[in-house]
Amino acid sequence: MAEEQAYHVSKGLECIKALRENPPNMEEIQEVSNIRDQTYKSSKESGTTGVQEEEITQNIDESHTPTKRSNSVSDVLQEDQRGREDNTAPVEAKDRIEEDTQTGPAVRRYYVYDHCGEKVKGIEDADSLMVPAGPPSNRGFEGREGSLDDSIEDSSEDYSEGNASSNWGYTFGLNPDRAADVSMLMEEELTALLGTGHNAGGQKRDGRTLQFPNSPEGSIGNQACEPIKKGTGEKLASHGMMTAAGLTNGATRSAPKSTGGSSGPNASAGSVPQSVTTAKMIQKCKTESGTRPQPEKPNEIESDGEYDDELFSEIQEIRSAITKLTEDNQSILSKLDTLLLLKGEIDSIKKQISKQNIAISTIEGHLSSIMIAIPGFGKDTGDPTANVDINPDVRPIIGRDSGRALAEVLKKPASSRGNQKDGGLILGSKGQLLKDLQLKPIDKNSSSAIGFKPKDSAPSKAVIASLIRSSKVDQSHKQNMLSLLKNIKGDDNLNEFYQMIKSISHI
């Protein structure tokens, strides 16, 4: 955009300075104005205003050199600037034209002059051109050959909502006291031609469209919004696509024209395709300088509508598929939560089983190392359990049976119980033990594992006191019995007291 603005400003300054050198005739200006008014009226009646506007513009701007343009509006400048002090020095336009023509048809170079007629130096790139809004003496413009692809009508559409100075980024405020100020020209047509493009950028006024002059290389601004499919066939620069493509859908944007000059011979090249195979592209061609947008065809509108319907249906299908996937994921997650709970319960059960196994193994270890004392000798013959083994797997303690374990010690069968009673043992006999080493049989009148026989002794009284405390008698009766127990003396009295306690407590 900066390059285009600098280009138009430099061209306008050239035209103004050239008009001072060769003032035009007022008759020619009046003739051109009459022709344009007549053509405008006829085109308004026939409904072909757009086509006639282009013809009018071409009639006005049919010359491309600054010297020929000066023949059409110089009298207006001369009349408007009478009585005004001329503060600017003349510029030799002929020298600049000779320098421009020496660069060749492919590359055209413009130079920037201030209002004093001096060339501005140090500006090499048009993109870095800054046009200040200060005094006219500090202003400089640099014009390079820029692409006419971006039209003034496009810029008016983009910046019509705000003011021109703030939206365009550059201020072209000229001092109205200077003779070269374009905005102070009093003639209506010249103001519409130059002042409108400077301030509004090509807005339509009174049914007329402002058209800027074509490039000195040739008329390339009247091309339609269609790409060049083939090369030029000659060593000329291919201008490519003359529209700025706006994409609403699709992927590929048209490539702009390269503004740099080529060092070698130029090769033929085609434009970038407007569409790709994987995505449909809707391209909106913006109006360029000297061009009109082509009307959309009905079949294209219908195809766009069908494409939108298909796209909407596909989006709906994708949305339903995503919803189904979400529901499936939710059900799967709920089942996973249940599985996690079951896994925790299974782990707790496994821990309990392992604890039970440890307890069982501990009990088994204790049972293998302990022998329970079940007497097998000393019972009365009238006892029904005398000859019955309660638990044959549990062995009695060694010593309850006389002569038990002698076979393991002497490696011979032990003596029977009858032989022990009838015949005596020979001391020192082979295979027999001394009598003193043998255990005595259980005394029926003394306390043993087969029964409690109370005696007037402290252990017997302690056993009876324990029986009283564990009984279900009232606490007051327990205290009375314990006090009586302390005063009892003698085996018979203690045995009688024991029998009474057994009857009371149902032992």
Swiss-Prot record:
The modification Phosphoserine is found at residue 151. Pfam families: Paramyx_P_V_C, Paramyxo_P_V_N. Disulfide bonds: none annotated. Keywords: Coiled coil, Phosphoprotein, Viral RNA replication. Residues 148-160 have a biased composition (Acidic residues). Homotetramer. Interacts (via multimerization domain) with polymerase L; this interaction forms the polymerase L-P complex. Interacts (via N-terminus) with N0 (via Ncore); this interaction allows P to chaperon N0 to avoid N polymerization before encapsidation. Interacts (via C-terminus) with N-RNA template; this interaction positions the polymerase on the template for both transcription and replication. This is Phosphoprotein. It comes from Phocine distemper virus (PDV). The lineage of its organism: Viruses, Riboviria, Orthornavirae, Negarnaviricota, Haploviricotina. The gene is P/V.
